[in-house]
């Protein structure tokens, strides 16, 4: 059998995730606390995680749409603190943008670009991710022939959906 397509996950495969997400999360939370000081009390407890769980329980497909889920967590918390829907949506949108900016401030593992360049010469390369990183925004999209995310497919690995989409490139 000849290998034609090589796929990659992104987080913790091409770059370390934990530090990046923690910094992005802190930036978004700091912004919200600067706008609504009482939010700090909720964001420093397990209440935030509880809201994540409640939203996923209410709509299980939300687990595939991390950006939308994060926005709704922010919005839910802000509204619980007395912000109007309009205020909560505005602040949540701004906080999500801050999070996404931070989420894309990362450093690839050593040698990643060199290896991708070598593999690109011989194989079709693709991305299959449950995360919400944007390879175009990261400037590495030129290495890949395709990219599928859980948000885009409304399904998460290890479900077969991602892999079936990748097979379309064989």
Show the residue positions of the predicted features.
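Structured loop/turn residues at beta-strand edges in well-structured enzyme cores
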Residues: 1, 121, 142
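N-terminal helical cap/lid subdomain that shapes the substrate entry/recognition surface
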Residues: 2-108
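Short, compositionally biased strand/turn segments
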Residues: 22, 122-123
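Active-site phosphate/pyrophosphate-handling residues
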Residues: 72, 114, 161
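Substrate-recognition "cap/lid" segment bordering the active-site pocket of phosphatases
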Residues: 105, 126, 131-170
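Catalytic-core regions built around general acid/base machinery
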Residues: 111-122
